[in-house]
Amino acid sequence: MTNLRKTHPLMKIVNSSFIDLPAPSNISSWWNFGSLLGVCLIIQILTGLFLAMHYTSDTMTAFSSVTHICRDVNYGWLIRYLHANGASMFFICLFLHIGRGLYYGSYMYLETWNIGVLLLFAVMATAFMGYVLPWGQMSFWGATVITNLLSAIPYIGSDLVEWIWGGFSVDKATLTRFFAFHFILPFIIAALAGVHLLFLHETGSNNPSGLSSDADKIPFHPYYTIKDILGVLLLILVLMSLVLFSPDLLGDPDNYTPANPLNTPPHIKPEWYFLFAYAILRSIPNKLGGVLALALSILVLAVVPFLHTSKQRSMMFRPFSQCLFWILVADLLTLTWIGGQPVEHPFVIIGQLASILYFLLILVIMPITSLFENNLLKW
């Protein structure tokens, strides 16, 4: 009798994706982050669902409802901090996952990569709208500053901003619609992640060497299921350590003050995972230029596959490209630090130099270095 998991219409989809999937025998722990992102998404959807049962999306009661969740709901504090810090873990995994893709040339799978870029945009939009919901000072002013950037779009800008606000400022209508979008987007993300996997399984996984692994495949289960479980346990360990020991470590103290349109906080800044993009935005003195640079800082990922000039796929055997990759990582960390600093000397000039270096590395220096490496190997 044929095994049910191979014949049942639903089971065979699961089987071909997670059980009998032929996987390269040499993929390292850097390939764990896809499954970790799936776990993060599930955690966020579940905790978010329970938070939504007690949250009210009204400007008068939003802040109080979050306080009520933390004080009066059974384990409400746990659910709330799991959700807030779960977002941070989500972005850590996301950045590492993208970094892996850049290092090992996984971006050569065009459809998978482009859906990944789309997923990054969707997750960033969801996180931004979620940050507005507690209706603290940083929620309100963050929403005001970021939505206001759209007014830089020529001709339609100011109308567009008022349309998004649903009025003449960030108010009840804005909060209500942000809650609605924040609720629906994770399900769209889950669907996109399914398509992401679908395209990945068309080609099979890449591997650290960047060479074809068709001749050397092993079944996903039990080898990589057990490896993924280890990753998940480590993720939960870090997440629970954050939630139970220092839940506010990555948050902003200003968000414990209810939103007040008449009082601007001294330093308006987004959550830590947006700081690199915020630094790039601030480093250009022109409003429209800043908005374009902000969009391009993420969109530049979509161009990466077309700038691949090396004859080798992975950076595993390319020491010069490796150096540049780690310079790019250091540059992004510098931008993240600058994004959290006030707009004054010397932070402004450091931010501008780091922003220029970011675009130069990806668009110019790395492709030229790859050609140089080809030359060294007389290819």
Curated annotation (Swiss-Prot):
It comes from the Eukaryota. A ubiquinone binds at residue 201. Component of the ubiquinol-cytochrome c reductase complex (complex III or cytochrome b-c1 complex) that is part of the mitochondrial respiratory chain. The b-c1 complex mediates electron transfer from ubiquinol to cytochrome c. Contributes to the generation of a proton gradient across the mitochondrial membrane that is then used for ATP synthesis. It is a multi-pass membrane protein. Belongs to the cytochrome b family. It comes from Sorex gracillimus. InterPro entries: Cyt_b/b6_C (IPR005798), Cyt_b/b6_C_sf (IPR036150), Cyt_b/b6_N (IPR005797), Cytb/b6-like_sf (IPR027387), Cytochrome_b (IPR030689), Cytochrome_b_C_euk/bac (IPR048260), Cytochrome_b_N_euk/bac (IPR048259), Di-haem_cyt_TM (IPR016174). Gene3D superfamilies: Cytochrome Bc1 Complex, Chain C. Its cofactor is heme b. It is found in: Mitochondrion inner membrane. This is Cytochrome b. Changing residue 98 to V: In strain: Isolate 94SAK2. The chain crosses the membrane at residues 33-53, 77-98, 113-133, 178-198, 226-246, 288-308, 320-340, 347-367. The gene is MT-CYB. GO terms for cellular component: mitochondrial inner membrane; respiratory chain complex III. Heme b b562 binds at residues 83, 182. The cytochrome bc1 complex contains 11 subunits: 3 respiratory subunits (MT-CYB, CYC1 and UQCRFS1), 2 core proteins (UQCRC1 and UQCRC2) and 6 low-molecular weight proteins (UQCRH/QCR6, UQCRB/QCR7, UQCRQ/QCR8, UQCR10/QCR9, UQCR11/QCR10 and a cleavage product of UQCRFS1). This cytochrome bc1 complex then forms a dimer. Heme 1 (or BL or b562) is low-potential and absorbs at about 562 nm, and heme 2 (or BH or b566) is high-potential and absorbs at about 566 nm. GO terms for biological process: mitochondrial electron transport, ubiquinol to cytochrome c. Heme b b566 binds at residues 97, 196. Binds 2 heme b groups non-covalently.
